[in-house]
C-alpha cells in the first residue's frame, strides 16, 4: 500500500503537461516559420538578410510570449520546476527544429552557428534563451504562479 499522497486534481500528470507543452510548441514552430518566411520575403529585401535577422528577433520573442500567455493555463504546469521544464522542452525542440530546417534549406554550419553567436552579430541565441522562461513568466503575469 502506497503512502504517497495523490497529485492534486488540478495538476496534470508529469507526462500530460509535457505533452500539452509539446502541442503548444508545435504552434510556436508554425508561427515562427511564418515569421521567418515573412522576414525573408519583406524585411530582407529592405534591410539585407543579416540586419533583417537581427531586427526580427524581438518579433520572434513576442510570438513565444503570446503562445505561452494563451496556453499556460491549459498546459497545466503550476510549479516553477514544471514551468521551466516546459520552457526547456520548447528551447531544445526549437534549437533542433531551426538547425534541421536551416540544413534542409542548404545553409552552412558556419551560417547556422553565426546566427547563435553574439560576437558575430547573431541574436538568435538570446531569443532562444527566452523560451526557457516564457512559460514561467506567462504563468506569473497571469497570476497562476
Predicted regions and their residues:
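Short, Lys/Arg-rich, polar N-terminal cytosolic tail immediately upstream
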Residues: 1-15
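N-terminal first-folded block
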Residues: 17-58
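Hydrophobic alpha-helical transmembrane segments
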Residues: 18-22, 26, 54-58, 83-88, ...
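Membrane-interface helix termini and inter-helical loops of multi-pass transporters
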Residues: 38-47, 106-116
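Internal alpha-helical transmembrane segments of multi-pass membrane proteins
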Residues: 49-54, 76-92
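Short aromatic-rich membrane-water interface segments that cap or initiate transmembrane helices
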Residues: 50-51, 113-125
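Hydrophobic cores of alpha-helical transmembrane segments in multi-pass inner/ER membrane proteins
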Residues: 61-69, 124-138
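Membrane-interface capping segments at transmembrane-helix boundaries
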Residues: 137-145
Amino acid at each position: 500500500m502506497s503512502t504517497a499522497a495523490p497529485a492534486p486534481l488540478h495538476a496534470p500528470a508529469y507526462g500530460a503537461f509535457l505533452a500539452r507543452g509539446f502541442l503548444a510548441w508545435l504552434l510556436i514552430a508554425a508561427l515562427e516559420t511564418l515569421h521567418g518566411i515573412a522576414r525573408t520575403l519583406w524585411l530582407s529585401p529592405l534591410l539585407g538578410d543579416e540586419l533583417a535577422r537581427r531586427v526580427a528577433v524581438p518579433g520572434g520573442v513576442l510570438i513565444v510570449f503570446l503562445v505561452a500567455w494563451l496556453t499556460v493555463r491549459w498546459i497545466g504546469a503550476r510549479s516553477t520546476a514544471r514551468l521551466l521544464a516546459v520552457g526547456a522542452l520548447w528551447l531544445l525542440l526549437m534549437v533542433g527544429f531551426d538547425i534541421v530546417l536551416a540544413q534542409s534549406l542548404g545553409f552552412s554550419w558556419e551560417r547556422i552557428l553565426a546566427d547563435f553567436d553574439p560576437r558575430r552579430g547573431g541574436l538568435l541565441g538570446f531569443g532562444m534563451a527566452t523560451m526557457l522562461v516564457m512559460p514561467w513568466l506567462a504563468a506569473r503575469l497571469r497570476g497562476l504562479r
